[in-house]
Every structure is written in C-alpha cells, then in structure tokens.
C-alpha cells in the first residue's frame, strides 16, 4: 500500500506541472507502458530489470532536510519506496543497457533478469552509464574481467575526469578497475552530445560531478536524480545524503523534472519505486 501511495504521489506531482493545453493530441503517437516494459512511439522497447532482491525502502534519515512533519504528512515514516534498477533497451536490432547494477558478487539480480528474457551478456552491444557509483558500474565486471565482451561503453567525460583523474586513490579503486577493463571500448561524451540510437546526453550533475540523464524519444533515463520519488517529486529542493553536491543535485532535479513535464516524457530511474517508471500523466 505504501508503495502504491508513493508512486501515485509522484505521478500526480509530475502531472500537476503541466497544463491540459500542452498535452499530446490524439493524433500523436504515444508510448505504451505495459508492466515492466515501455514501448516508445519509434518502436524502441525499454525493459526494467530489478537488481535488488526483495523490497527496497530508503530510510527517512537519508533526507535530513525533510522535517518529521513533512515525512508524516506524506505517510513515509516507514521509509520511502525505491529500488535498485537497470534498464534494457532494444533499438534498431541492438540490445543496450543503461547502467549495470551492483554486480552478482554483491547480490545484484540483473543477470537473472536478462536470463529470463533469453539474453546473455554477449547480447549487449552498448552500455550507457549515468555515473560511476558502485550500484551502477558493479555489474561491469565478473571475476575481475569485463562481463560484456562485445559492448561499447558510453560515459560522461566530466564523470571520468572527476573519478579517474581527480578522486583520491582510496576512493576510486572500483572505478579505475572498471574503466581500465573497458578502455579500448570506452567513449567519453560531453553534455548535449547525441549518441548512438539518437540518445541525447543531458547535464544532471550534483549527485556526482558528471551525473547524466539520457533522452530517447519520449523517455528520460534519470539515473539517481531521485532516491525518494514520493518525497522529491513534490519537494525537489530536498537532496539525499548520497548526493555529492546537494545544491547542484537540487538544481538539476528541479530543472529536469520541469523539462520532463513540459515535454511529457516518461522517466526511468535507477531508484524509482518498482517498476521504476513514472508516466507523464
């Protein structure tokens, strides 16, 4: 019940940001959400892959800027429904991944989800990374070797610079190991670049220095823009302790939520409540 309430609050908040006169007309092709799969108007399929086992609640202590009164008013005293998620994309005959989760050695379930769909790591042609935290790049390696033998990897140049060239060595061991393993297949982009399959990389910095959102047709993959959608959809000014720069994260959240509302975009987020999609109305 708590999860349903939280998702309803999130969807209502996004819908409230738009006016009826700006809604898509009946003649326009619209995306279709069916369970854990979103089909875009251009035929691209986006499939949610659950990476965490069981249910996931973010503790209210993750959001110290939120008052106890606000948490109580939203009915979130038990925690804020969330997930650890990745997303598959099937476009132009290729299977692609947005982020790779925790990794099987840390309890990640991504590979199990792929197996259920009849896919293996060799099926993946491209991996797009929203940022370099361990629950997003943890699935890149298996037994210290690249898991995705045929995949090209796309990552923010800003994120790469911050983690690989500027971060103290005691904080970037996993990041260096992953980037070195894929160095010959790594493509660094700038914000605003159009990548393969028409995906546009958008500035979503704050959670990490180069945190990226990806826009594809009616979809916006928002990474870790929100860790508690039921709270942050209505109060984007509230950041979580996971955000490396809380002020920048709040600015990005407000800007991107407004952008998604104005363009009627579905959002897919790595910590949104299951099944990790938020509709635009």
Residue ranges and their predicted role:
Residues 101-182:
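Active-site HxH/HxHxD metal-binding segment of metal-dependent hydrolases
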Residues 97-100, 125-135, 154-156, 189, ...:
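Active-site neighborhood of phospho(di)ester-bond hydrolases with catalytic His/Asp-centered motifs
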Residues 2-8:
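Sec-dependent signal peptide recognition
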Residues 17-111, 115, 126, 152-203, 218-224, 248-264:
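Metallo-beta-lactamase
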Residues 57, 105, 132-139, 208-212, ...:
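Active-site environment of divalent metal-dependent phosphoester hydrolases
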Residues 218-281:
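Cap/insert and terminal regions of metallo-dependent hydrolase folds
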Residues 11-16:
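Hydrophobic h-region of N-terminal signal peptides that target proteins for export
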């Amino acid at each position: 019940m708590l999860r349903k309430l939280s998702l309803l609050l999130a969807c209502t908040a996004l819908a409230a940001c738009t006016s009826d006169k700006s809604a898509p007309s009946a003649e326009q092709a619209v995306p279709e959400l069916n369970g854990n799969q979103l089909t875009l108007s251009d035929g691209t399929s986006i499939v949610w892959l659950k990476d965490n086992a069981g249910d996931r609640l973010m503790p209210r202590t993750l959001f110290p800027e939120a008052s106890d009164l606000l948490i109580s008013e939203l009915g979130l005293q038990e925690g804020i429904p969330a997930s650890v998620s990745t997303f598959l994309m099937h476009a132009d005959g290729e299977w692609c991944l947005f982020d790779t989760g925790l990794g099987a050695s840390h309890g990640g379930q991504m590979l199990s989800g792929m197996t259920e769909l009849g896919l293996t790591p060799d099926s993946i042609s491209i991996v797009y990374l929203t940022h370099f935290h361990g629950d997003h790049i943890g699935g890149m390696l298996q037994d210290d070797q690249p898991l995705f033998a045929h995949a090209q990897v796309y990552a923010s140049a800003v994120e790469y610079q911050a983690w690989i060239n500027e971060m103290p060595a005691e904080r970037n061991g996993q990041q260096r190991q992953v980037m070195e393993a894929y160095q010959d297949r790594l493509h660094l982009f700038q914000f605003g670049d159009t990548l393969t399959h028409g995906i546009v990389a958008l500035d979503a910095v704050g959670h990490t220095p180069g945190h990226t959102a990806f826009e594809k047709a009616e979809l916006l993959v928002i990474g870790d823009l929100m860790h508690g959608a039921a709270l942050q959809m209505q109060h984007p000014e509230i950041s979580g302790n996971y955000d490396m720069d809380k002020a920048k994260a709040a600015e990005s959240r407000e800007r991107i939520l407004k952008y998604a509302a104005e363009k009627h975009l579905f959002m897919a987020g790595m910590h949104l409540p299951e099944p990790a999609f938020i509709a635009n109305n």
